Amino acid sequence: MSKDKNKNVCKNLSFAECELTILRMAVDKAGEKMGKRSVNSPDVQNIINIVEDFIKRKNLICYGGTAINSILPEEDQFYNKDVEIPDYDFFSFDALKDAKELADIYFKKGFTDVEAKSGQHHGTYKVFVNYIAVADITYIPKGIFNALKKDSLRVDGVLYAPPNFLRMSMYLELSRPAGDISRWEKVLKRLLLLNKNYQITDVNCNNVDFQRKMANVENQEIIYETVEKALINQGVVFFGGFANALYSQYMPHQQRQKLEHYADFDVLSNDPETTAEIVKERLIDKGIKNIKIIKQDAVGEIVPEHYEVKIGKDSVLFAYKPIGCHSYNVLISKGKKLKIATIDTMLSLYLAFLYADKDYYNQFIDRILCMSKFLFDVQQKNRLQQKGLLQRFSIICYGHQDSIEEMKAEKAAKYKELKQSGNKKELEEWFLNYKPDDIKNTPTKEIKTYKNKEKKPKKKTIKKRVVNPYDNKSRKNKKWLY
């Protein structure tokens, strides 16, 4: 590096800071040189081509950093393909089978150091070739897979998850202060690039209602006040049309959404069944009849288990069990403390509903998209306010976030349970450790033949020794969502 260049780099820096800056530049330069050498090697190029061909042939859906990078215009891409080996994350509705199949393909192509292993997250399998992580294959139910595929973008023959799904994954991560916050800066940078190039919706939202209207308007005001009070008293977190209307106060008058007294509530509750039961009891106290509670199962891992409260044909409440620890802010209204989900939390949930393939979401797709766009606009217009409901990256959260230690303990307990039960299929699903080379080289004992004077020759076959694929520890798996 020339002296003149050193002076420019070190302008306004102390001697020690300048020395460290020069060191970092040297490290970056050396890393780039080694990266180019690795990426351009024939073996690595072959490895990349094989996994890309596999994804194309099976029409699997890529997600994560590689997906975001691939759908951005070249000037906004953050990966340098000349120095970085792409790590493909993709969805499959038959992930275990696909992981083993991909490992077999590499082995047949002449690679001997090949293995497919379970990740830390159940349902995710990692494929390694020559000790390089080349693929993370994550299971999702076929219904979600098909919903994603419908809106996926194809680039050079590879399917990439829809922008709104990729956006949802990043909002989800930014809404979990008890998660891996060391990733937040990287995630936000990528989210800004995605938002710059892809809008949430092009639907005309001027005539879209943000609250569910009730078909039966009789006792509408009583129902609204009763449900609202019951939910506030339970300390749940609001995130539906009720919460959306509260955020509208931060928009210009002509863009504000009026909060109508429709019983239209969506909340997070640590015990959604109890929340629904209490709401039903309070409604009965007010003489309301024809109330029923419907349990709705989780949709993969994008929409949690929830309970719907209906009065006749009208849905007045959806209470969801948290799938992590979701950030919220506190609003004091009429002397009451209301917990309102942050915009990041609300967007992560709304955008997930788009791919749940449930009738009660599908009939309100435009509403969900427009509510999401409205919240996005609120956030953009008030990005640096950091007060009241607008405080972003709140460190208070609702729900439980599993730690790495808890996940490891769960897997250890599961391994013990499955070993005792002898359920080999489920054991493999949880603890896959598949090495094609070991299967090929498993020794077989000689087959001996015994003769008896009075009997015909009879063969006795000794079965092949089965290798236990679960002896090794699993490599730590990175987060599947992003």
Predicted features along the sequence, with ranges:
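Short, conserved charged micro-motifs
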Residues: L96-A103, E273-K280
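N-terminal regions immediately upstream of nucleotidyltransferase
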Residues: M1-N46, R154-I222, N441-K458, I462-Y470, ...
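Active-site and adjacent loop segments of nucleotide-processing enzymes
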Residues: A135-M214, S315-Y450
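Residue-level detection of beta-strand-connecting loop/turn positions
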Residues: V9-N12, Y131, K313-S315, G335
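Active-site nucleotide-donor binding segment shared across nucleotidyl transfer reactions
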Residues: V44-L96, I222-E273
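Conserved catalytic core of two-metal-ion nucleotidyltransferases
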Residues: D104-N146, R282-Y328
